[in-house]
Amino acid sequence: MTQPVQTIDVLLAEHADLERRLSDPDLHSNPDEARKAGRRFARLAPIVGTYRKLMAAREDLETARELAADDDSFTAEVADLESRVAQLDTQLTDMLAPRDPHDADDIVLEVKSGEGGEESALFAADLARMYIRYAERHGWTVTVLDEITSDLGGYKDATLSIRSKGDSADGVWSRMKFEGGVHRVQRVPVTESQGRVHTSAAGVLVYPEPEEVAEVQIDESDLRIDVFRSSGKGGQGVNTTDSAVRITHLPTGVVVTCQNERSQLQNKARALQVLAARLQAMAEEQASAEASADRASQIRTVDRSERIRTYNFPENRITDHRIGFKAHNLDQVLDGDLDALFDALAAADKQSRLQQA
């Protein structure tokens, strides 16, 4: 194992401290702190468990070798234990490899139509439904924070909040962080009378959502807050009061709108959370040239040539161009069956992190 012993010792001490804190009733009087501690504990628990299994297997192996020196019947057990120790050692090394610090986070996801007009907006809505169905399969909570619909019910722009309900070390971000980029579709549009296949594109942006807005420094004087009446699909009014909120961050020009909560205060709170997520992502990009390069796949302009994935309807095929993944189950993918693709993307990301370690 290439990781220094000091690393696991530090994690063991932190795990023990968190276990003590989580058993203290006083901690749970602060739900935010309790949730944060619970998430960190959940992240460390599998590492500590694997380490303890490895230590036990090493002790068993040492005992088996001593017995095998006097009795050949223990030779097979030695071989089995050597294999188990090697397996656990590799597993622990993988667990200690550098991880994305946001893996346990919830996300804000934006879907934007691009080239292709009405067809692009319809495809953007298909992508949003795909992510919603995937989230439902995993028991996550999805909230549509804002939506601008097209004449045929597509999405010109939509913002979703996707949150897990537990404290898993592998949260929503760990699964969906690879979705940022341009998604291209090849199909016969509903507006096409000649039956010709057209190509259009929609863009997806994904941000890890800070647990608290306070984690991101936002100066109130840098904000312009506008309120207006919420509207439903097709422009139908759903609220007779000015409950929708639009926040503009003046230094960066970032604009966030939220109109689907029940009150102006709730919409403002959610809009601030989305703004915090976007500003956090921008700050991290600026702070790290490597992170900026990794996020080059996140769209700057929704151009069909800057694609990360193609959805080919005539061939029922999905292709992820970053890792060469291909599958002929597009209908199932659009119904939220994304785990095979996400597993492949996660494996490629893990391999990259191990090489950089």
Curated annotation (Swiss-Prot):
Subcellular location: Cytoplasm
GO molecular function: translation release factor activity, codon specific
InterPro entries: PCRF (IPR005139), Pep_chain_release_fac_I (IPR000352), Pep_chain_release_fac_I_sf (IPR045853), Prokaryotic/Mito_RF (IPR050057), RF-1 (IPR004373)
Positions of modified residues (N5-methylglutamine): 236
Function: Peptide chain release factor 1 directs the termination of translation in response to the peptide chain termination codons UAG and UAA.
PROSITE patterns cross-referenced by the UniProt entry: RF_PROK_I
Domain of life: Bacteria
Predominant localisation class: cytoplasm
Family: Belongs to the prokaryotic/mitochondrial release factor family.
Alphabetized Pfam families for the sequence: PCRF (PF03462), RF-1 (PF00472)
GO cellular component: cytoplasm
PTM text: Methylated by PrmC. Methylation increases the termination efficiency of RF1.
NCBIfam families in UniProt: prfA (TIGR00019), PRK00591.1 (NF001859)
Listed name of the protein: Peptide chain release factor 1
Organism of derivation: Mycolicibacterium paratuberculosis (strain ATCC BAA-968 / K-10)
Keywords: Cytoplasm, Methylation, Protein biosynthesis
